[in-house]
Amino acid sequence: MEPGNYATLDGAKDIEGLLGAGGGRNLVAHSPLTSHPAAPTLMPAVNYAPLDLPGSAEPPKQCHPCPGVPQGTSPAPVPYGYFGGGYYSCRVSRSSLKPCAQAATLAAYPAETPTAGEEYPSRPTEFAFYPGYPGTYQPMASYLDVSVVQTLGAPGEPRHDSLLPVDSYQSWALAGGWNSQMCCQGEQNPPGPFWKAAFADSSGQHPPDACAFRRGRKKRIPYSKGQLRELEREYAANKFITKDKRRKISAATSLSERQITIWFQNRRVKEKKVLAKVKNSATP
């Protein structure tokens, strides 16, 4: 068909054959209805050989010619986008891949090798955590191998002394009963130097009294002469004090009613002992 003529019936049949076969997608470039018989040449026509990758197992597929294109003529150049936007997968073997350039750069630097303990024969053992350990660590103070008194021995030398001086255990003797003496400073072992240094202030403010701790009893406070005179006067008048008299004496002597009651009980017991002693001495 010449360029200036219109499309004939044979040309329409050729178009229907192309649409039914599905040989191409972009038929605008090959349609005889357009003003140009062929697409403009974008690049020189080059025949490419099929690519055979080393890792590919399937044979390359051959492209079948379109039924509407005459075979005798030279093939026209295919424009961009003729086969659509699809992609073709390929397989590549691992041997064809190139190694990373960074690995070659890092390979130029030698790797550090672990150093054995025999390479440091001149290193002193006191700078290590344990004796004979060829490490670079400083000795760490712990309660297991370091004494409390740091002046005993060289620094870093392991010691196995106890943390604090502990006195030996002694059970309390209750031979005299519950009213007997429970704790006395003179009978205990003297405390260690650490306890003396730590509690020097507290012991200075509250000096310990000998045998001051008793079970259920307070420290005895002696009565003054004025209080004893008032109590003896009332005892001479009446050996058994009444409630009103007890209140008056409590207000006059600044003593509690319980203290006055106990004093009268003790005074009666004392009088009985004195009378019994006089009676025993009078009998032949």
Curated annotation (Swiss-Prot):
Subcellular location: Nucleus
One GO BP annotation of this record: epidermis development
DNA-binding region ranges: 216-275
Methyltransferase is among the record's keywords: no
Molecular-function annotations in GO: DNA-binding transcription factor activity, RNA polymerase II-specific; DNA-binding transcription repressor activity, RNA polymerase II-specific; methyl-CpG binding; RNA polymerase II cis-regulatory region sequence-specific DNA binding; sequence-specific DNA binding; sequence-specific double-stranded DNA binding
CDD domains per UniProt: homeodomain
Keywords: Developmental protein, Disease variant, DNA-binding, Homeobox, Nucleus, Transcription, Transcription regulation
Disulfide bonds, paired cysteine numbers: none
Principal place of residence: nucleus
Matches recorded under SMART domains: HOX (SM00389)
InterPro entries (UniProt xref): AP_axis_regulatory_Homeobox, HD, Homeobox_CS, Homeodomain-like_sf, HoxA13_N
The organism's place on the tree of life at top rank: Eukaryota
Function: Sequence-specific transcription factor which is part of a developmental regulatory system that provides cells with specific positional identities on the anterior-posterior axis. Binds preferentially to methylated DNA.
Protein name according to UniProt: Homeobox protein Hox-B13
Organism annotation: Homo sapiens (Human)
